[in-house]
Every structure is written in structure tokens, then in C-alpha cells.
Amino acid sequence: MSTDISPPYSQTHVEPVNGYPSDNKRCDDSSVPAKYDDLVRNSALFWEKLRAFLGLTSKTLKVPTVGGNTLDLHRLFIEVTSRGGIERVVKDRKWKEVIGAFSFPTTITSASFVLRKYYLKFLFQLEHVYYLEKPVSSLQSTDEALKSLANESPNPEEGIDEPQVGYEVQGFIDGKFDSGYLVTMKLGSQELKGVLYHIPQTPSQSQQTMETPSAIVQSSQRRHRKKSKLAVVDTQKPKCHRSGYNFFFAEQYARLKPEYHGQERSITKKIGHMWSNLTESEKQVYQDKGVKDVERYRIEMLEYKSSHESGATASTVAQ
């Protein structure tokens, strides 16, 4: 996701950072020699030089967003260079300090990786020429810089606290079975595959929920609702269709249960891994069964609805 900033001088306010006062006079001549201190103090000059380095003198500069907010590249440039530059920040593991200058949502667990990526893409050249005061001819490519920094820090998240319980992550469901789901989750730059399962309630857990009077009342109400639901269950209603994974799970569960007696969690995880390792042709065998079961369910539901409609009509006539 990106945000159009046109012209770049729209960022007309910069808070004093590291002792540098704010000075937002517009620079009308990009050919005027500039120094690092000038870019720090003058945000308009910073944006003009950045556009020139990116070759966007006549185009709109698309500034990236992080956590739903536009990333302040000027602030990022100051925070990194004031700590010795990108190489020093990575080597000394100072990304946490840099991130502290921004108000990112707590759900972002890969902020250091994201900031490093955008710094290399947008600001690496400015640092090389204006902060390190090296000639443009000695500037290595962004890809080479990325490889070099990767060797310095094999873990892009170094210096960042580990994700805590309660963090939100994005993902999708690959398959469903009786005890849970096969899922793929995205955590920063990593893509993780696993099993999301429901832990069955044990008798000891049930006993704990009934230790207080309020728990007894709630438990009684739940039992009452459960009995009410059981009382209205239609035993003639067709059994819901199953997916290809459901057929695979049932087959493997019956095979593994004697070997892993009482280890429901282990069985579930093992079957999930087995399904993930199947080839597409092997999965297709079970998916075909799922397609047939969907058709079975459709036909049985038509018959079920037809019989109920005829029964309701007969009841109305009798009245």
C-alpha cells in the first residue's frame, strides 16, 4: 500500500530531532550544493534531493505506509544516520531505538525488517552521499547492500521483543477437520504452516468451572440450553457433507488411534503433517470423495425438504 505525496513539500513541519531545529524553507534550485546538516534541518530540501536521487523530478513520489500511516522518510533518515548509518544500526542492533521514534501499532511484529527494507529502497543513496560524504561512483547497488547487511545480521528482527500473546496475525485456512483447521499464518516476512485445533474439555476442567455459585448457575443454564437443543434435533435431516480432508482424517485417525491411544493432540498434528506432505494427485483422490459427498448431501437435502413440505401440507389440510 502506498500514499501519493505531491508535491513532496507538503510535509512542512518537522519536529526538532537530536538537537536540529526545524527549518522548512523551500529549496527552488536542486543544483545548489547541500550538506547533511542541511537535509536534516530543511525537510523541503530533503524531499527535493530524495526525488532527484530516485529520478522522480517530474513524477509523484509514492511514500510507503506502515501500520496504516504514512512513513515519515525524513524522520527515518534522521533516526538512522544519527546512530551512525544503516550499517551501524544493524550491527549494533539499534532498530528498537529507531522504531521507538515512530508510533507503530503493537500488532506490527516485523517493524525492523520493514524499516530496513524501505531505508535501503529510498534513503540508502542519500546516506552514502550526504552523511558518509562518499562519491556517487562508489555507491553499491541496493541489492549488494542488502546482501551485505544480511550477512551482518542473519535475523532481521534482532533487537526486537518477541511477539507476545494477544498479537494479531494474518492467515488463511487450508483445510478443516473435526478437531480444528490446517492453517497458514504470516508473521512478518515468515510464512508458517500448522494446525489450529480445539482442546477438548477434561473432567477436571469441568469441575473447576463449578467451584463458585455463579459458575454453578452458568453451568446449569448451559446444560438447560444443551438439553433444549437436543430436544429439537431432527434425526432425519441429512448428515452434512465432508471435505476431502475430512475423509483423509477419518481414514488416518482409525489407523493411528491404536498406536497413539489417548494422544488426540499428537494424532491430530501427525495427520495434519501427513496431509501437507501429500502430492496434488494423492490429495485429489480424497477431494473427489468430497465432491461426491457434496452431491450426496444436495440430493438428500432436496428429498428431505420435499418430504417436509408435503408433510406440512397434509397437516394443514387435516386442521
UniProtKB/Swiss-Prot annotation:
Keyword Membrane: no
Biased composition (Polar residues): 1-13, 203-220
SUPFAM superfamilies assigned: ARID-like, HMG-box
Main localization of the protein described in the UniProt heading: nucleus
DNA-binding region coordinates: 238-305
Region (Disordered): 1-25, 203-230
Domain ARID: 40-131
PROSITE patterns for this protein: ARID, HMG_BOX_2
Keywords: DNA-binding, Nucleus, Transcription, Transcription regulation
Subcellular location: Nucleus
GO CC annotation terms, alphabetical: nucleus
Single GO MF descriptor: DNA binding
Family annotation (InterPro entries): ARID_dom (IPR001606), ARID_dom_sf (IPR036431), ARID_HMGB9-like (IPR045303), HMG_box_dom (IPR009071), HMG_box_dom_sf (IPR036910)
Tissue expression as described in the entry: Ubiquitously expressed.
This protein's record includes keyword Transcription: yes
Function of the protein: Binds preferentially DNA with A/T-rich content.
PANTHER family: HIGH MOBILITY GROUP B PROTEIN 10-RELATED, HIGH MOBILITY GROUP B PROTEIN 9
Name this polypeptide is given: High mobility group B protein 10
UniProt organism field: Arabidopsis thaliana (Mouse-ear cress)
Lineage: Eukaryota, Viridiplantae, Streptophyta, Embryophyta, Tracheophyta
